[in-house]
From Swiss-Prot:
<feature type="transmembrane region" description="Helical">
    <location>
        <begin position="780"/>
        <end position="800"/>
    </location>
</feature>
<keyword id="KW-0472">Membrane</keyword>
<keyword id="KW-1133">Transmembrane helix</keyword>
<feature type="region of interest" description="Disordered">
    <location>
        <begin position="1"/>
        <end position="165"/>
    </location>
</feature>
<dbReference type="GO" id="GO:0006031">
    <property type="term" value="P:chitin biosynthetic process"/>
</dbReference>
<feature type="transmembrane region" description="Helical">
    <location>
        <begin position="808"/>
        <end position="828"/>
    </location>
</feature>
<feature type="transmembrane region" description="Helical">
    <location>
        <begin position="906"/>
        <end position="926"/>
    </location>
</feature>
<dbReference type="Pfam" id="PF01644">
    <property type="entry name" value="Chitin_synth_1"/>
</dbReference>
<protein>
    <recommendedName>
        <fullName>Chitin synthase II</fullName>
        <ecNumber>2.4.1.16</ecNumber>
    </recommendedName>
</protein>
<feature type="transmembrane region" description="Helical">
    <location>
        <begin position="704"/>
        <end position="724"/>
    </location>
</feature>
<dbReference type="InterPro" id="IPR013616">
    <property type="entry name" value="Chitin_synth_N"/>
</dbReference>
<comment type="similarity">
    <text>Belongs to the chitin synthase family. Class II subfamily.</text>
</comment>
<comment type="function">
    <text>Polymerizes chitin, a structural polymer of the cell wall and septum, by transferring the sugar moiety of UDP-GlcNAc to the non-reducing end of the growing chitin polymer. Contributes to the production of conidia and the ability of fungal conidia to germinate. Involved in fungal stress tolerances.</text>
</comment>
<dbReference type="GO" id="GO:1902404">
    <property type="term" value="P:mitotic actomyosin contractile ring contraction"/>
</dbReference>
<feature type="region of interest" description="Disordered">
    <location>
        <begin position="178"/>
        <end position="209"/>
    </location>
</feature>
<dbReference type="InterPro" id="IPR004835">
    <property type="entry name" value="Chitin_synth"/>
</dbReference>
<feature type="compositionally biased region" description="Low complexity">
    <location>
        <begin position="63"/>
        <end position="78"/>
    </location>
</feature>
């Protein structure tokens, strides 16, 4: 390979200066540990009187201007005497072609300085490389061919490429080693403190300021070849971070560090005028989240120049999700923050609206977080490796809190996005919990620790993997701004359908898409009209922080919400333990039923969020077990506690609506409890209708044979489902669960065929009448047509009918699996309450600790800025290479498993006997031939139709209220005046519309 020519004099290795007045510990910030970056000039050439004159700090440059006079030659070595080396050939001509006959140049730098002509300065100060086309920012070595996959970032907005005068020749430059290494953080010369203008790859210019006037063809290229290195070689440019012990002062007895950000990240930041942009703040929290404020911990938003009011506090919880899921959510959040800042006419938001928004990322367990997710956080500047400690003065650290205001974002393709793509600064808090303590504990850190320190107005909860729409968070916040009675709100959760809807080819994804759509069209609008939404999904929901607070006695929504975290073992009965699997349902109930208040919950249709739904059977069953058990027991809890509504400050009309909703929920609860028997009986009567020889479409009694086979298959399959659910995990019996769902699909297909055949035969029969009454036409055709027809009508009413054509068939085929597989597995595993804390109470020591006496401690930290840069470079390289992470082994069984299993047995036996008695009794009373005279079938079908009509009425009311609100708000905004020719009649109409709008809002 071609090697570059060597410099004409030995390199100079200088030590960085730490005498910056802002970097030394002060009384206000005694624990500040700030490492010198290459952007802080440690040399001053104004005086040569003393050796220390060169160590005086210079004002930090705020432009990124390559040098036009500084050479690549380094100053004299720190050695007393330079090594004696032969001078280079005087015939050397820069920028000339190399030839084999040219004289060989020495390998080491010469002790003499040879004067060479300088090439003309380049008009382009930056490579024309798109920062967004690479998963990592570039380094200056890419100009020299050192790493072609690392392009330079675009020029910052404040740079001036045209400024090439000598007055600014040494502004923001740094020397680059020309040995092909990727390590761009070389020693600084006496003429520059940052990056130089790259020259020809095969040349090394001296300090001459002459322009290039020789003929380039006279240049002779010299080839250098050396021996191949022996043994395994590390990656070129990779430098292992070096740690050294430092003494720092504690703040209020706690470890708080201000650490400079990596050099590469600093190089393309548009804003560098505040510490929040140039330094990452680390706090080692050694207390419980409830004592965070009392112990004197602070966040940047409550100290110094960054003291601000927080209007919106966003929580993103994660466990072990990879970098793709994290960046999908984080980039969407940053685009939403940009939307807040784009609302220039808003009284709350505007250009600096980002200062009122704080994003808190909470990871559940330091050993559980995905390593690539940590790399993504490091790329954004909010995380640095080697800073955290396990204990401070023998006190165990409970959480590691990193704070930084980032100006870059990573999209789902791991491409950098900055101000050129509309990204605005974002205040980040990254809380890395030391132990794995479940999502509920993460919310306790969010509400009781950080929320108490910031006192926000609205809190938004997001799960990693959920991608909110570009303006969804604004609409969610607006619901609280327009109605002071709203305590909680949620948006529409959509299933992620993939590119061109490719994910819908999976029947499991398509069925969930249909289920989500029906819930967002029928259930959520109905509950929003009543004012009580049974569950605000944690994937995309918001709460008013003031409404969540407990009363003076300590009782309130948050106390009940976090009660589930303190329940352990036999001290918590199975009912309470399962109820707190859906703690978000308990929080919704406690808000609406809060004593002396009139809080309501609202559904915001314009707020949407996409989430990836399970696409495999084991993950799907495990997810629904928690949902179904939590929903069932939480519904029972709210129905038992219905008297709490009387102690609220709701109006009489609102209380009546809430009690109507309780009746509706009670009916739904009964149908859920007996859903297994209802499915079997529906199959028994509908499919059994083809056993009649006069109705049999196949003839020769084939319909009776098929029904008998499917009937026994269904009974055996249900029994097998109990055995599977009691003894096997879904992950350990994938094929059995998949086979059972396929067989249920076959049974549902035959039942649907029988139903359609009976309907067609009834409609085409000449002797049949279509009168409404106790007959097949009324009981079967009208009831089923009304149910399915309402689905179509309401979907078209909301202008979202596509799921009826793309996902309805898959949903109806998998409907028996929803009932039999999911319900059976959920009830058979009521003992499985995942606490997530077994074996995680050992204090780790892998990070080291901060040990000392008094207010000063000693700890290991990166030695210099180069070590911070090395960690950042490694994180970017990991993201670029997409390094795989080995999976973790399966965890052990949870504590108190034997106790919960004993209670589970009684629960399952009672439920199975109740459904069995109902199924056997009805099947014995009614034959399988008289569908028109079957009272039970008629009751089931009409009950389903009635519930659908009730949901449709609520959904229609919701739509009407929205239309009226839009009309009223439009009239106010446009300031429409009633024409004078309408006289007093027009003013009466205007007053009537306003009163109707205000009454509907209340």
């Amino acid at each position: 390979m071609d090697r570059p020519n060597t410099p004409s004099r030995p390199p100079e290795y200088t030590l960085p200066s730490y005498e910056d007045e802002h970097d030394t510990p002060t009384g206000q910030n005694p624990a500040a540990v700030r490492l010198l970056t290459s952007f802080e000039d440690p040399f001053d050439h104004s005086s040569k009187s003393s050796p220390r004159a060169n160590l005086r700090p210079r004002t930090t440059r705020r432009s990124y201007q390559p040098s036009v006079v500084s050479s690549h030659s380094r100053s004299a070595s720190v050695l007393d005497e330079a090594p004696s080396m032969p001078p280079p050939d005087s015939s050397y001509v820069p920028f000339a072609h190399r030839e084999t006959s040219s004289p060989h140049r020495p390998w080491t730098p010469s002790s003499r300085v040879s004067e060479f002509s300088r090439p003309p300065p380049s008009n382009v100060s930056y490579e024309p490389s798109d920062l967004n086309g690479s998963p990592r920012p570039g380094t200056p070595s890419s100009r020299y061919g050192g790493s072609p996959r690392r392009p330079l970032p675009p020029a910052p907005l404040f740079s001036n490429p045209g400024r090439t005068s000598q007055a600014f020749a040494d502004d923001a430059t740094v020397s680059i080693p020309l040995d092909g290494s990727d390590d761009v953080f070389g020693p600084e010369t006496d003429l520059s403190d940052s990056r130089p203008l790259p020259t020809h790859r095969d040349s090394f210019m001296s300090g001459s300021q002459e322009t290039l006037n020789e003929d380039a063809e006279d240049y002779v290229k010299v080839e250098h070849y050396g021996p191949a290195p022996d043994g395994a070689q590390e990656r070129r440019g990779v430098r292992a971070p070096q740690m050294s012990k430092k003494e720092v002062q504690l703040i209020n007895g706690e470890l708080v560090l201000e650490c400079k950000i990596p050099t590469i990240l600093y190089s393309f930041l548009p804003r560098r005028n505040e510490v929040e942009f140039t330094h990452m703040r680390y706090t080692a929290v050694t207390c419980d989240p409830d004592d965070f404020v009392e112990r004197g911990y602070n966040l940047r938003q409550s100290i110094g120049r960054t003291t601000r009011e927080t209007e919106l506090f966003i929580c993103i919880t994660m466990y072990n999700e990879d970098e793709i899921c994290f960046t999908r959510t984080m980039h969407a959040v940053m685009k939403n923050i940009s939307h807040f800042c784009s609302r220039s006419r808003s009284r709350t938001w505007g250009e600096n609206g980002w200062q009122k928004i704080v994003v808190c990322i909470i990871s559940d367990g330091r050993e559980k977080i995905h390593p690539r997710t940590l790399d993504a956080l490091a790329a954004m500047g909010v995380y640095q490796h080697g800073i955290a400690k396990n204990f401070v003065n023998n006190r165990a650290v409970q959480a590691h809190v990193y704070e930084y205001t980032t100006q870059v974002s990573l999209d789902a393709d791991l491409k950098f996005k900055g101000a050129e793509k509309g990204i605005v600064p974002c205040q980040l808090i990254f809380c890395l919990k030391e132990k794995n303590s479940r999502k509920l504990n993460s919310h306790r850190w969010f509400f009781n620790a950080f929320g108490k320190a910031l006192n926000p107005n609205v809190c938004i909860l997001l799960d990693v993997g959920t991608r909110p729409g570009s303006n969804s968070l604004y609409h969610l916040w607006k619901a609280f701004d327009t109605d002071s009675n709203v305590a909680g709100a949620c948006g529409e959760i959509k299933a992620m359908k993939g590119r061109f809807g490719s994910n819908l080819l999976n029947p499991l994804v398509a069925s969930q898409n249909f289920e989500y759509k029906l819930s967002n069209i029928l259930d959520k609008p109905l509950e929003s009209v009543f004012g009580y939404i049974t569950v605000l999904p944690g994937a995309l929901s918001a709460y008013r922080y003031h409404a969540l607070q407990n009363d003076e006695t300590g009782h309130g929504p948050l106390s009940q919400y976090f009660k589930g975290e303190t329940l352990h073992g036999q001290h918590a009965d199975v009912f309470t333990a399962n109820m707190y699997l859906a703690e978000d349902r308990i929080l919704c109930w406690e808000l609406v039923a809060k004593r002396g208040e009139r809080w309501v919950l609202k559904y915001v249709k314009s707020c949407t969020g996409e989430t990836d739904v399970p696409d495999a059977v084991p993950e799907f069953i495990s997810q629904r077990r928690r949902w179904l058990n939590g929903a069932f027991f939480a519904a029972v809890y709210s129905l038992v506690q219905f008297r709490q509504i009387l102690a609220t400050d709701h109006t009489i009309a609102r209380k009546i609506l809430l009690y109507i909703e309780f009746v509706y929920q009670f009916v739904q609860l009964l149908f859920t409890y007996f859903s297994l028997a209802n499915f079997y009986l529906t199959f028994y009567f509908v499919a059994g209708g083809l056993t009649d020889k006069t109705v049999d479409p196949f003839g020769h009694n084939i319909g009776s044979v098929i029904f008998t086979i499917l009937r026994y298959t269904c009974v055996l399959l249900i029994a097998t489902q109990f055995i599977l659910s009691l003894g096997n995990r879904p992950q350990g019996a994938k094929k059995l669960y998949l086979a059972s769902m396929i067989i249920y699909g076959v049974i549902m297909t035959y039942t649907s065929f029988a139903c359609i055949y009976i309907v067609v035969r009834q409609l085409t029969g000449k002797s049949q009448d279509f009168a409404i009454g106790n007959n097949v036409f009324t009981n079967l055709i009208v009831s089923m047509a009304s149910t399915i027809g309402l689905y179509f009508v309401m979907s078209f009413l909301y202008l979202e009918p596509w799921h009826m054509f793309t996902s309805s068939l898959q949903y109806f085929l998998l409907l028996p699996s929803y009932i039999c597989t999911l319900q059976v597995y959920a009830f058979c595993n009521t003992h499985d309450v995942t606490w997530g804390t077994k074996g995680d109470n050992v204090i780790k020591t892998d990070l080291g600790g901060a040990v000392g006496k008094g207010e000063t401690v000693e700890l290991e930290m990166p030695s210099e800025q180069l070590d911070i840069d090395s960690g950042y470079d490694e994180a970017l390289r990991n993201l670029r290479d997409r390094l795989a992470v080995p999976g973790s082994p399966v965890s052990e069984a949870q504590m108190q498993e034997d106790y919960y299993k004993s209670v589970r047995t009684y629960m399952v036996v009672t439920w199975m006997i109740a459904n069995g008695i109902l199924a056997m009794a009805v099947s014995e009373i009614y034959s399988n031939k008289g569908i028109g005279d079957n009272f039970y079938l008629r009751f089931i079908l009409w009950a389903v139709a009635s519930l659908a009509i009730f949901r449709a009425l609520g959904s229609t009311t919701f739509a009407i209220i929205n239309v009226v609100n839009i009309v009223v708000e439009g009239r106010i905004r446009m300031n429409v005046k009633v024409p004078s020719w309408m006289g007093g009649f027009g003013s009466k109409i205007s007053e009537k519309v306003s009163s109707v709008g205000s009454s509907l809002k209340s």
